[in-house]
């Protein structure tokens, strides 16, 4: 894929929305560089809608929707979306909020099954900030190498 700077000017003028991933794309090597963030500010200032799309948890998405120059954040691999509208956060979820408790029990049961098959696995450090998914630590903070995971 070519960088946006290589797009023809006419094509750039037709862009209305920029959707972007975080890990390994917008954020490199666990670092959000100032220049990258400033680029996002410039995109938004030029009237282009900005939407972050990530597998990261609801807690992270809430912060991004409040403080980042974005129109919306899609999080937990599409399970939820947060948008800032008139100074307030609008929260949408793929699943009905009424199903949250039963859904969580199902996920906890699935993780318990995984633990019997893979005793060394652990939940991701940010699991407590998640609403609709379970994240297994795949060498982010665990002692297990990514190859083993």
Regions found by a protein language model. Give the residues of each.
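Non-catalytic pre-domain segments flanking phosphatase-related domains
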Residues: 1-20
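A general structural motif
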Residues: 13-15, 47, 131
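Conserved PLP phosphate-binding loop immediately N-terminal to the Schiff-base lysine helix
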Residues: 29
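Active-site phosphate-binding/coordination module
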Residues: 32-128
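Short, conserved charged micro-motifs
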Residues: 103-105, 142-149
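Short beta-strand-to-loop capping motifs
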Residues: 136-140
């Amino acid at each position: 894929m070519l960088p946006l700077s290589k797009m023809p000017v006419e094509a750039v003028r037709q862009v209305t929305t920029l959707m972007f991933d975080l890990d390994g794309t917008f954020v490199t090597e666990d670092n959000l560089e100032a220049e990258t963030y400033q680029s996002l500010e410039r995109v938004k200032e030029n009237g282009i809608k900005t939407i972050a799309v990530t597998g990261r948890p609801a807690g992270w998405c809430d912060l991004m929707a409040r403080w980042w120059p974005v129109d919306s954040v899609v999080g937990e691999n599409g399970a939820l979306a947060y948008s800032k509208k008139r100074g307030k956060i609008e929260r949408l979820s793929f699943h009905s909020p009424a199903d949250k408790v039963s859904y969580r029990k199902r996920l906890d049961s699935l993780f318990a099954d995984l633990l019997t098959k893979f005793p060394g696995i652990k939940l991701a450090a940010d699991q407590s900030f998640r609403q609709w998914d379970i994240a297994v630590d795949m060498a982010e903070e665990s002692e297990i190498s990514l190859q083993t995971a």
